[in-house]
Design a protein with these regions (language model features):
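N-terminal low-structure segments adjacent to metalloprotease catalytic domains
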Residues: 1-147, 274-319
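Metzincin-family zinc-dependent endopeptidase catalytic domain
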Residues: 18, 46, 51, 85, ...
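Metalloprotease/metallohydrolase-associated module, dominated by Zn2+-dependent proteases
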Residues: 163-218, 234-319
């Protein structure tokens, strides 16, 4: 196990910058906002933690990348900044949910609401579903698990992929079902199944896992992470952060839902929200039962309670 701890001087430079204009921008934050952002610089800080690498299969040792500080982010000419006519995030579902449509549509709505709180100040809308066939995607059946997979070139699997230049991301939640890796997983195809290329009928009435609190939490993580890439946020190397890369499910599970101070400043500089307003919106999402008129379904937020307490500590520090 390895703990990656950066010197305070290095963290301060990554957060605030050495450029005079960016230092002046930083000084525009309120005292409360700076207190939260600078918690990582204090020896008694309670909000942010150093990155822990548990094994060589974790993302950082498996995929070495450069650290990307605020100044590098702000200087990137390709970073995305919302503007008039381009300030909406769209969620497009792919495939039919069949008999599970009622509850799955609620799940998509909860994701939409979370995304709108996370990217506070932007509008998030859902688009009508499209068929898998209409995407023309490549797929395969995993020879070991008999699970159906959408094929991503050069990867054996992905939780999600996003493109800054295209402003688009694709996320899959099948692996977030606790039973996905079990031998009796309900979504397995029959042994020996070999659908022909282009035969998308295999997706008809495909298994939809139950919407649990753990699945919802994992889904919120991957959505916020991949959409972050669309804004130019690269994989975080500084502190525990939702923008850290994840090479496997166990690594993803131990990561936080929150942004570290450096990535938070990057996102805030792009969107322009008040940090307290964003935290309040996220806390409201955690506390809201998520019910919809005429539908008896409570949003399963048990797995989010620790996150809710963290948000409350942030808000208390800013008062």
């Amino acid at each position: 196990m390895q703990i990656i701890e950066h010197p305070v001087k290095k963290l301060r430079a990554a957060l605030i910058s050495s450029r005079l204009d960016l230092i002046e921008r930083y000084q525009q934050y309120s005292d409360g906002e700076k207190k939260v952002l600078e918690d990582c610089l204090r020896p008694d800080g309670v909000l942010f933690r150093a990155i822990t690498v548990r094994s060589d299969s974790d993302w950082i040792p498996a995929h070495p990348e450069e650290s990307y500080d605020f100044q590098s982010f702000f200087s990137n000419p390709y970073r995305s900044t919302p503007c008039k006519g381009h300030h909406t995030i769209y969620i497009q579902t792919i495939g039919s949910f069949g008999e599970a449509a009622l509850h799955t549509n609620l799940y998509v709505e909860w994701l939409r609401q979370y995304c709108e709180a996370f990217y506070y100040g932007l509008v998030v809308k859902t688009l009508p579903p499209v068929t898998v066939q209409s995407t023309g995607c490549t797929f395969r059946v995993n020879s070991c698990s008999n699970n159906l997979q959408l094929y991503a070139e050069s990867w054996n699997f992905v939780f999600g992929q996003a493109s800054l230049t295209e402003g688009m991301g694709v996320f899959s939640f099948a692996r977030y079902d606790d039973n996905f890796y079990q031998r009796n997983y309900a979504g397995q195809l029959k042994k020996g199944s070999k659908p022909k290329p282009g035969d998308y009928s295999v997706f008809n009435n495909y298994y939809i896992p139950p919407i649990t609190s753990t699945l919802l939490l994992r889904s919120c993580k991957v959505v916020s992470h991949e959409v972050g890439h669309m804004f130019g946020l690269q994989h975080c190397q500084w502190l525990q952060c939702v923008m850290q890369g994840s090479n496997h499910l166990e690594e993803s599970d131990r990561g936080p839902l929150s942004l570290c101070p450096i990535c938070l400043r990057k996102l805030q500089s792009s969107i322009g929200f008040k940090i307290a307003d964003r935290y309040k919106a996220l806390l409201q999402w955690v506390h809201d039962d998520g019910g919809s008129a005429g539908v008896h379904a409570v949003k399963p937020t048990e797995a989010f309670q620790e996150y809710g307490q963290w948000l409350q500590r942030c808000l208390a520090m800013m008062e």
